Each structure stands twice: as C-alpha cells, then as structure tokens.
C-alpha cells in the first residue's frame, strides 16, 4: 500500500497476552486524518482483558493501548483542528461518527482503537498505542495542555474520561456523598475528580495497603472491604456511587450503600462483560442502577 506508515510496536500474538516486538504498517494519512508520533502510552486493564481473549475471540497480532499521548507530525489537507507540532491525545476511539454530539462511543460505526475490523488498515484491524505512531481521524484526538507531561496525560484518555463522564452527568455538587468502589487505575481517578467537585468521597477497597494513598487523594474515608456483607453497616450513606471493579463480585451490598432513589453507575468490565445481580437486592435499595462506557470527544477535551 502506498504511503503506509511503518511502525514499531509491542503486540500480543495469542491469548497468553504476552507482548513482543513487532513491526507493521499503518494506513496512509487521509484528508481528515492526523499522524501522531507517540511519546507515552499507559497500560489499561482493558488491554489485559482483550489480549487474553476475556471479551471474545481476537485477531492477532494485535497491538494494545488506548491511552496515547504524542506530537502531531502530519495532517491531512482538510484538517484545521491540529497543526504539525501540536501535542495530541488519543483514547478509545480512532474513527466513526463525527456528528453524534458527545455520544460517539455509542454509534455503531465507531472504530475503537485496537482489535476492531478496519478494511483501510493493512493488518485488517485497528492497532493501538504500544507503538511509535498512530493515524487517527482528527475528530477523535484531543489537544493536550502544554503544562501536562505526556506520561501524566495518557491515563486520562481512558481511565480519566471513563470516570469523569458519569460523574459529570451525575451533577455532583459540593457536599454530596460519593462512593468509589475499586481503587485501581479508574478508581483513583474517580476519587480525585469527585474531590475536585467538592464531594465527600468514601472509597471502598479490598486492599488495606492502599489506604494511605487514597487518603492522599482527598477521600474523607476509606472502607476496607473484608466481607461484602459488612457493607450493610453503611446502608443509605451515599448519594451516588461509581463502581470500577473489573471482576465478578457481590454487587447488592455495594448498591445498598446508596440512598433510596440515588444512583449507582457501573464502569468496570468483567470477563465476558457479565455481572450477576440480585433483583431483591436492588429492589430492597430502590437505587437507580446504570452503566457507562468511556465518554464522548467534547467532554474528553473538557476534562
């Protein structure tokens, strides 16, 4: 293919998830695209799930990574949003609907950053950010502030927006009691974002060794969960909870910590995308239960 972009990367070659050096070619830069030289790509738990086939059969070789920060080195002739030399970030989407008013992630034409069928790509699928370069539709890249390093910006492109979007939609206000369940990559972002909105944050973790760090993020209280049933002691404490736990667990005790008619948002993605719910557990709490997937481009730039 003419004008393809020679790229070095780390790719998974099978469901072991082990990544190894690999060289491949990306599609050419088209009129609405930009080419980014990648300076930092952070690791998301999604990378592990997908490369190990936890979310379904994969095509290999596959380059993971959807938390990407770098410098624009080429722009298509129609691009006005970016110029060569700009700092840019790419998250979980690289192409698709450009008129979806902040809901691009829910459009059926959306091309996610790696592992998705794409006839324009020489490898037949999109390839992610554990690589030297990436070609992306300009709409699906964001400007990065000059004062933020590539390393610090990269995790915001998935972990950040995945928690920012539902917290903003929940209209968190000063003094609201917000719970964050699961304090990993997403959870620590959720704590910081909720604190920045003036919320009283209650963090729920199974890892006692994280308590000091979580308090440092600004959480009012850290609850170490040894037995989920102990959570009923905190029933009705919260106005809102965001849950980032990425595996099967007892959900009802966590939901019970939210006040009746409050909201519980699930952003964790367990193996097989499946969770087990107790209907009576939800009914007894009368909590509004919903889920959220990353965020749109407008709110990503806002974040």
Please state what every model-predicted region is.
Residues 96-181:
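NAD(P)H dinucleotide-binding glycine-rich loop of Rossmann-like/cofactor-binding domains
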Residues 187-188:
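N-terminal Rossmann-fold NAD(P) dinucleotide-binding loop
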């Amino acid at each position: 293919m003419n004008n393809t972009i020679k790229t070095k990367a780390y790719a998974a070659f099978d469901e072991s998830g082990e990544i190894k050096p690999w060289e491949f070619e990306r599609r050419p830069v088209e009129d609405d695209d930009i080419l980014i030289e990648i300076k930092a790509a952070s690791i998301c738990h999604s990378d592990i799930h997908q490369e190990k086939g936890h979310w379904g059969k994969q095509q290999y070789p596959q380059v993971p990574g959807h938390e990407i920060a770098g410098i624009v080195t080429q722009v298509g002739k129609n691009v006005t949003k970016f110029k060569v030399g700009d700092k840019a970030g790419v998250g979980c989407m690289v192409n698709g609907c450009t008129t979806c008013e902040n809901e691009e992630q829910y459009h059926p034409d959306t091309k996610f950053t790696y592992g998705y069928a794409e006839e324009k790509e020489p490898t037949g699928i999109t390839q992610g950010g554990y690589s030297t370069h990436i070609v992306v539709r300009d709409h699906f890249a964001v400007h990065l502030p000059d004062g933020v390093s590539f390393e610090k910006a990269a995790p915001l492109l998935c972990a950040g927006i995945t928690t920012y979007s539902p917290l903003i939609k929940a209209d968190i206000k000063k003094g609201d009691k917000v719970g964050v369940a699961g304090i990993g990559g997403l959870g620590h972002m959720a704590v910081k974002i909720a604190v920045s909105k003036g919320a009283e944050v209650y963090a729920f973790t199974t890892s006692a060794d994280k308590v000091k760090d979580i308090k440092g993020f600004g959480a009012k209280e850290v609850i170490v969960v040894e037995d989920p049933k102990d959570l009923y002691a905190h029933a009705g404490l919260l106005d809102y909870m965001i849950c980032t736990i990425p595996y099967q667990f007892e959900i009802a005790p966590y939901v019970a910590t939210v006040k009746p008619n409050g909201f519980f948002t699930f952003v964790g993605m367990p193996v097989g995308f499946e969770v087990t719910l107790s209907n009576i557990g939800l009914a007894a709490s009368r909590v509004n239960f919903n889920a959220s997937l990353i965020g749109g481009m407008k709110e990503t730039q806002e974040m």
